């Protein structure tokens, strides 16, 4: 996708992409078809293929590889991505532990493969994952169940990034049932997760018999009623993608509403996101991954708004990405990971201020 950038921003984009190519070429040589998650002291030591094949982030490394193959045509990226995808078949066999994040796992691996190469085996894998996701649908509550906990009425805003798998299955099979499930879920998230000011709940708990909202736990943010920044980012990008596939105006309006809230918050911290926009001012906890994901959503929004609106969203995205580059990126090709200072949640220490694989994907 081409964006109408001024000369300064275009120069920055071009130079940054050259750095990305250099860095990821070296990483691909080192990592190959292992499945990285968090880099420790500049090294992706854990291989999720060996330790947790059903982990929700396992699709991001092959997603990076497919992006690089698509951009450069270098075969090594394709070879490594295919290797990871083969390993992910074990997750289908395990089954227990898979949940709503099958979209994250197979959209960026198998579906990306099929879109780029036409690989029929990858198509089958993507459709298998789509059926698993659709099978989590609660027809009385009109939502897709999140996670595998003892409360089957839980829904998290992250799920918005997984429903594009269902739209892809709709198009691939010509079967509208996948869209019906997706849109019911997106409507439920829109009506119960997004607040009037554009901030979002991370978790909503719904009555499984009728979809009535029961409670809003704090989740990975500071607490109930707070504003977990990556959750806001999932909403921005997720609603924009649902608009892309359905053209339902309410989805674009919702994406814009959350985007305006997000932009107003990161403007207070020079373009980078804290973990939660409604947490105490001290201590300061950052989450770089929220910013880069939100930037993707802002660019997606810019593709669907009138010409006079486009510049606002593009410039906001570029500001976030430039700030991330300046404050949080490591371009040493001998050091695994680019985007530093990612955080999984507000209260956990082991995944606070660390490089997390999805930061580099977005």
Labelled PLM ranges:
Residues 1-362:
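Glycan-recognition and catalytic cores of secretory/periplasmic carbohydrate-active enzymes
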């Amino acid at each position: 996708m081409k964006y109408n950038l001024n000369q300064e921003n275009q120069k920055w984009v071009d130079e940054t992409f050259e750095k990305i190519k250099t860095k990821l070429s070296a990483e691909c040589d080192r990592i190959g078809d292992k499945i990285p998650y968090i880099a420790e002291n500049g090294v992706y030591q854990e291989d999720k293929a060996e330790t947790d094949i059903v982990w929700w982030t396992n699709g991001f490394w092959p997603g990076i590889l497919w992006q690089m193959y698509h951009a450069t045509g270098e075969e090594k990226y394709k070879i490594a991505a295919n290797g990871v995808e083969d390993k992910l078949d074990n997750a289908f066999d395990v089954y227990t532990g898979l949940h709503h994040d099958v979209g994250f796992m197979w959209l960026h691996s198998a579906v990306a493969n099929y879109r780029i190469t036409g690989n029929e085996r990858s198509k089958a894998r993507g459709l298998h994952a789509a059926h698993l996701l659709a099978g989590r649908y609660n027809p009385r509550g009109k939502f897709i169940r999140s996670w595998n906990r003892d409360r089957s009425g839980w829904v998290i805003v992250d799920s918005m990034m997984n429903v594009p798998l269902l739209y892809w299955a709709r198009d691939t099979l010509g079967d509208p049932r996948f869209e019906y499930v997706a849109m019911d879920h997106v409507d439920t998230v829109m009506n119960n997760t997004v607040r009037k000011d554009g901030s979002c709940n991370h978790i909503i708990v719904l009555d499984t018999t009728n979809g009535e909202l029961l409670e809003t736990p704090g989740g990975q943010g500071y607490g109930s009623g707070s504003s977990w920044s990556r959750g806001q980012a999932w909403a921005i990008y997720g609603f924009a993608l649902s608009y892309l596939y359905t053209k339902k105006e309410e989805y674009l309006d919702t994406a814009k509403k959350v985007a305006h809230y997000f932009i107003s918050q990161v403007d207070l911290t020079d373009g980078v996101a804290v973990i939660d926009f409604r947490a105490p001012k001290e201590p300061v906890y950052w989450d770089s991954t929220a910013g880069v994901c939100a930037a993707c959503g802002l660019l997606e929004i810019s593709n669907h708004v009138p010409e006079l609106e486009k510049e606002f969203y593009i410039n906001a995205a570029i500001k976030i990405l430039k700030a991330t580059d300046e404050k949080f990126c490591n371009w040493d090709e001998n050091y695994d990971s680019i985007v530093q200072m990612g955080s999984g949640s507000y209260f956990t220490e082991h995944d606070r201020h660390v490089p997390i694989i999805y930061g580099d994907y977005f």
